[in-house]
Amino acid sequence: MCAVSSVSEFPQFIDIEESPNSLDCEGCIQCQMGSKLVLFITGNCHWRCDYCPLSETRRDIDFMYANERPCNDFDEVIEEARAMRATGAGITGGDPLMARERSLEGIRRLKREFGDDFHIHMYTSIPFKAQWASEFADAGLDEIRFHFLDLSSQEYKEVIEACSDAGIFTGVEPVSYTHLRAHETLNH
């Protein structure tokens, strides 16, 4: 008879509680804390990036999600924000400017429901019309992040200045090293 002994030992995990960096912007801090609602406003995007992580069920589909919950209207978005006790929202997509009016409505509804302290940031890769900056500021957008796709900031200069002048905290998402190396290779 063979004796089998088994030892149940679980791996030991180090409890790492990394605090957000005090230099991080408010949107980053709240995301790191897990307190921001992810508002996927549309799957539509004018770019066709081959590295886009959107699945077939979201890419080029004009539908809205709050976190992973499909939402038909902003009442459902607000319900999801309440359920998670969100302190803010990050608006993303495809590209939120492909559903500009819906993005503006979402900002207004969330601010009306949760107040001015409910922090809202939005991502875009579109160098939009500078006059739209005041519309987003008036709606209550706190922060905007531009993702340069061609590694050139020139076409974004006017809208970045307009957003900043309108009181929207304005940032640029860093370009990945791989993307940068590919760009250098193609242009040399």
Label the predicted regions.
Residues S8-E18, D24-P70:
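Canonical Radical SAM [4Fe-4S] cluster-binding loop centered on the CxxxCxxC motif
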Residues G27-N44, R82-A83, G88-G90, G94-E101:
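A short, flexible N-terminal coil/short beta segment enriched in small residues
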Residues I78, L104-R108, A133, K157-I160:
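Generic structural signal for well-ordered alpha-helices
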Residues F74:
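Divalent cation-coordinating acidic motifs and surrounding scaffolds
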Residues T57-C71, M84-A99, K111-W132, F136-E155, ...:
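Core AdoMet radical
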Residues T178-T185:
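Conserved small/polar residues in nucleotide/adenosyl-binding loops
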Residues S164:
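Anion (oxyanion) recognition and catalysis
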